[in-house]
């Protein structure tokens, strides 16, 4: 019996109907440059720069399927009004030889009810910190409406020229919360057993697949673990992933974990930029963060490729293409992932630190990125997501450039 050779990082690879120029994609990271949800030149330039830097595909982060599905008021709602700007974005990415993906979702319990001025949707009645009060479980009619929103949004993404659509099934946003035994206490067709808790995400994915057609890839960002007590863990997430695979509507699954609602550091790892978070918030919120921040943001030591131990179990159980995510900063990590059977890797912070990193990997001028996992990029989502270390170097170099 012969073993198939490990694919090269820089050979073209298939993702559903698409051919990607290499095995590295830019993971969705909220860009923070969409004032009142508008497509801006900064957003377009952000993704064009990533594409120019060599990534095979760049993902526009968190496009809400409705105003109520926004994380806050500066979240893009992907509807017909956004089409002209989104077409400019996909054209800019394509001009650099890369493909463009749109991450679409509904924030659910993570939504900011006050700025959205809409009702928060959740699987079940519970207290919600972002809503600052009790949130009632969504009705069947409301959930039907969200399915229609996903379907419409997928059509807009296709019209805008996106090559792939990533459905957000992670971090305890709406679809992820339906999978979670901690958040889903329903007693109807969408709650109870593992199979029933998978039913609503299945319905949404099918609607997106039908709307997207056969020439656009459909993927899911999927929670392997919520990282919280009584939440979703591998004993239940693996069977759900197998159900989604059997449905046949997904071209790939990007594996993640954690909860934006209850445990945000789980999918970052490394240093907690608490002082920077406090400074980025209004005074009252900042005071609260100062005292309760250590509980809200527990510390997890950073390890290169930190989701690999969990993801390895998914690789063994599934046949569909898988995208490895989580602290990938080195060439040898990527090679190891491909050797273990992952079709692609997704990078985020490393490309914030150096958008040219993929080109440098290919030229063999470096074998690892410069990200130090200080996570000080996290609080910049309110003013334009960026690497503050990179910013400081640019400022420091400016006088030399003027000499």
From Swiss-Prot:
pH-activity profile: Optimum pH is 8.0.
Cofactor field: FMN
Top-level class of the enzyme under EC nomenclature: oxidoreductase
Domain of life: Bacteria
Keyword line: Flavoprotein, FMN, NAD, Oxidoreductase
Annotated GO MF terms: FMN binding; oxidoreductase activity
Presence of the UniProt keyword Amino-acid biosynthesis in the record: no
Active-site residue list: 173 (proton donor)
Keyword Membrane belongs to the record: no
Record's catalysed reaction(s): 2 4-sulfanylbutanoate + NAD(+) = 4,4'-disulfanyldibutanoate + NADH + H(+)
Role played: Involved in the degradation of the organic disulfide 4,4'-dithiodibutyric acid (DTDB). Catalyzes the initial cleavage of DTDB into 2 molecules of 4-mercaptobutyric acid (4MB). Low activities are observed with other disulfide compounds, such as 3,3'-dithiodipropionic acid DTDP, 3,3'-thiodipropionic acid TDP and DTNB.
PANTHER family tied to this protein: BINDING OXIDOREDUCTASE, PUTATIVE (AFU_ORTHOLOGUE AFUA_2G08260)-RELATED
Name of this protein: 4,4'-dithiodibutanoate disulfide reductase
Organism taxonomic ancestry: Bacteria, Bacillati, Actinomycetota, Actinomycetes, Mycobacteriales
């Amino acid at each position: 019996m012969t073993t198939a050779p490990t694919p090269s990082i820089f050979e073209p690879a298939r993702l559903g109907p698409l051919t990607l120029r290499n095995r590295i994609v830019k993971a969705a990271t909220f860009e923070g440059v969409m004032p009142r949800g508008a497509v801006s030149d900064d957003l377009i330039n952000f993704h064009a720069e990533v594409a120019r830097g060599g990534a095979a595909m760049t993902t526009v982060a968190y496009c809400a399927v409705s105003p109520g599905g926004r994380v806050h008021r500066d979240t893009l709602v992907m509807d017909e009004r956004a089409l002209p700007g989104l077409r400019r974005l996909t054209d800019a990415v394509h001009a650099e030889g890369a493909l463009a993906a749109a991450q679409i979702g509904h924030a659910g319990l993570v939504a900011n009810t006050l700025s959205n001025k809409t009702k928060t949707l959740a699987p079940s009645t519970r207290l919600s910190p972002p809503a600052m009060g009790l949130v009632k479980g969504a009705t069947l009619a409301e959930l039907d409406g969200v399915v229609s929103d996903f379907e419409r949004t997928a059509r807009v993404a296709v019209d805008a020229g996106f090559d792939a659509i990533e459905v957000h099934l992670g971090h305890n946003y709406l679809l992820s919360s339906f999978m979670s035994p901690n958040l889903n206490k329903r007693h109807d067709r969408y709650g109870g057993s593992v199979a029933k808790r998978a039913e609503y995400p299945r319905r949404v994915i099918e609607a997106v697949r039908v709307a997207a057609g056969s020439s656009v890839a459909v993927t899911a960002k999927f929670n392997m673990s919520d990282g919280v007590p009584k939440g979703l863990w591998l004993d239940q997430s693996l069977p759900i992933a197998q159900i989604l695979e059997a449905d046949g509507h997904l071209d790939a699954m990007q594996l993640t974990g954690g909860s934006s609602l209850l445990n945000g550091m789980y999918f970052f790892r490394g240093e907690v930029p608490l002082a920077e978070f406090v400074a980025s918030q209004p005074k009252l919120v900042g005071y609260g963060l100062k005292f309760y921040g250590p509980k809200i943001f527990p510390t997890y030591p950073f390890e290169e490729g930190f989701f690999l131990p969990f993801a390895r179990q998914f690789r063994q159980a599934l046949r569909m293409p898988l995208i490895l995510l989580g602290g990938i900063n080195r060439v040898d990590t990527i090679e190891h992932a491909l050797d273990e059977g992952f079709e692609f890797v997704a990078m985020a912070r490393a490309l914030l630190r150096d958008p040219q990193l993929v080109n440098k990997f290919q030229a063999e001028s470096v074998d690892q990125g410069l990200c130090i996992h200080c996570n000080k990029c996290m609080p910049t989502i309110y003013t334009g997501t960026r690497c503050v270390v990179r910013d400081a170097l640019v400022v420091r170099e400016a006088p030399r450039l003027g000499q």
